[in-house]
Amino acid sequence: MSKLLLVALFGAIAVVATSAEVLNLNGRSLLNNDDPNAFPYCKCTYRQRRSPYRLKYVGAENNYKGNDWLCYSIVLDTTGTVCQTVPLTEPCCSADLYKIEFDVKPSCKGTVTRAMVFKGIDRTVGGVRVLESISTVGIDDVTGVPGAAILRIVKDLALPYSVVASFLPNGLPVCINRVPGSCTFPELFMDVNGTASYSVFNSDKDCCPTGLSGPNVNPIGPAPNNSPLPPSPQPTASSRPPSPPPSPRPPSPPPPSPSPPPPPPPPPPPPPPPPPSPPPPPPPPPPPPPPPPPPSPSPPRKPPSPSPPVPPPPSPPSVLPAATGFPFCECVSRSPSSYPWRVTVANVSAVTISGGAGERVCLKISVDNAAAATCNNGLGGCCSDGLEKVELFANGKCKGSILPFTLSNTAEIRSSFSWDSTRPVLKFTRLGLTYAQGVAGGSLCFNIKGAGCTKFADLCPGRGCTVAVFNNPDNTCCPRVGTIA
């Protein structure tokens, strides 16, 4: 009887284990999400500095076995990671390879139907055969995350770390096809340059180094962190302090012009002498002349000078929500001449999110060449600094309508944004972009969906959102750098 109970118990455990695996692969219901709205939509070690796995962009492979392919290469690179010392103490430094996931547009289902792993390879390493294989794949919605979908490659991909390492330096090729007439790759990956957001998982699914790969992105991102130092001399060499003078714009000097009129009043006193022509009685009249002096007090009546405050009224037309005082923080320098980072609108496209209309907004974040050439390091010393944060003075009614963002051309994906608790300010934080990455330029993309707002014009009405940029690490410089609409 006890044996029967044990058999039943083991059977139940097997069923539960199988169900758990299915849930992990499809809906990830068993994974505790720290941020359920952020790719890769699960709790795992996603920082690239803790794993050597990278997905390097290779390019197109046309008409191979009846398909046109876009190919990448799985490589191991420890540059800028904690995986450079032996023995390896970090568990993700020597993790096995299990699957790759891409963050894709839900409405592009049917765009990718095949995945090819290990193209052109047939080799046995340590008793493990590595062989080209083509399998069927598809795009799956992410449970509980509206407007999110995943393209997953699992079949025939699993390999031990030692086998993956034996294919250095070229790595292991992985390709996906594209069905003619479907979404383009920029549409599929929701990036104008076709940059893909990816995660590489181990079999325990607790390691998921996450990054970007595309024609304009070097997936081995941590290394450039030291590169911003060289550019620093360039901006300082051509610094142009004159930029600060424009900032003072006190029109107050005009009021003094009224002061000259007071001198003319003194001439009136000469007329009083004619009255003295009469006999002694006139002397008493001279006291009346003192009343004329009262006109002189009129000059002190500069209280009319308060008229100068009238100039402030023109400021309101700057933008629908007045951005007076923005950004609301203390910085060493607020001058755009001290910090060359700029933000512009790259593109805005219509999207459907959970059956409702919305828009995807991509902002170009970069170091402006002209601003860098004339940057004045004497105003705060931020000319060669990286970018930590971007703030938008926006429509506060859009709180709850912004979905997490993706950031291209960086070593990691970050999706940290928030609204100020008391003011209508949308903040994109923890960007961690280096100066060198700013020179290359990057895209910050996010979705806008109801209920409060569904369009970029809702978020940035009128003349648009006023933008402020902050250097890292201590927000020394925080200039306003224009508006976007």
Swiss-Prot record:
InterPro entries named in the record: Pherophorin (IPR024616)
Compositionally biased spans, kind Pro residues: 221-234, 241-317
Keyword vocabulary terms for this entry: Glycoprotein, Hydroxylation, Signal
Coiled-coil ranges per UniProt: none
Annotated region (Disordered), positions in chain: 212-317
Residues carrying sugar: 193, 347
Plastid found in the keyword field: no
Taxonomic superkingdom: Eukaryota
Range of residues in the leader sequence: 1-20
Modifications made to the protein after synthesis: Intersubunit cross-links are formed between saccharide chains rather than between polypeptide chains. Hydroxylated on proline residues in the Pro-rich central domain.
Signal as UniProt keyword: yes
Stated role: The extracellular matrix (ECM) of Volvox contains insoluble fibrous layers that surround individual cells at a distance to form contiguous cellular compartments. SSG 185 is the monomeric precursor of this substructure (C3Z structure).
Complexes and interactors: Polymer.
The protein's name in its UniProt record: Sulfated surface glycoprotein 185
Lineage: Eukaryota, Viridiplantae, Chlorophyta, core chlorophytes, Chlorophyceae
